[in-house]
Amino acid sequence: MSKAHPPELKKFTDKKFSLKLNGGRHVQGILRGFDPFMNLVIDECVEMATSGQQKNIGMVEIRGNSIIMLEALERV
């Protein structure tokens, strides 16, 4: 059985990200940490509602299996 490898996200730590999540949710924030299952810790997180409203939700942990897409908003 192959061993799980951690995601290559170390160079993106402390950079701003946009994440598309299952359930049609979209959040933006700063990547503070991650684990081999791609669970992410996002700081200064803002939820972007489909109506255009933004809601500050602070520091959150996002499970890796709920992430559909992630995009770095800053150059590495």
From Swiss-Prot:
Its main location: nucleus. It comes from the Eukaryota. One of its GO terms (cellular component) is spliceosomal tri-snRNP complex. CDD domains: Sm_G. It is found in: Nucleus. SUPFAM superfamilies: Sm-like ribonucleoproteins (SSF50182). One of its GO terms (biological process) is mRNA splicing, via spliceosome. InterPro entries: Lsm7/SmG-like, LSM_dom_sf, Sm, Sm_dom_euk/arc, Sm_G. Residues 4-76 form the Sm domain. One of its GO terms (molecular function) is RNA binding. Keywords: mRNA processing, mRNA splicing, Nucleus, Ribonucleoprotein, RNA-binding, Spliceosome. Coiled coil: none annotated. Associated with snRNP U1, U2, U4/U6 and U5. Belongs to the snRNP Sm proteins family. This is Putative small nuclear ribonucleoprotein G-like protein 15. The gene is SNRPGP15.
